[in-house]
Amino acid sequence: MWRMPTDFRDGKTFPRRGREAIGDALWLARVADKGRAAAAGTIYDYIYPCPMDQGMMERWGISADEFNEALRRNPTDESLFAWFSDRVRDEDIRVANEWLVRERSENLDRQDAEEVAPVQSR
């Protein structure tokens, strides 16, 4: 039962990348990390739900309120994905993934470039 860190205030810890999937759903890991951090008050300078979060949720057919409730009730990725799989159709996951990869690849590339822990000086 793995839980990712959700305290991003140190500037060295980041939400998982948007390309990282839980099951077949891209972005789900990232939005879960950010939602959990927002609920804990440790989101730092991230925005939740940001326009990308909202775009994926819209394509999944769920609202931010539904997702927040699911996060509250499902503290692990495994239990969250069980809820998600029951709630979101495979076709909606496919459409959301395609939108993310085809139309938002610049955002994904920017995450990869910007969300890097600072190099420690000697």
Regions found by a protein language model. Name each.
Residues 77-90, 97-101:
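Charged interaction scaffolds used for protein-protein
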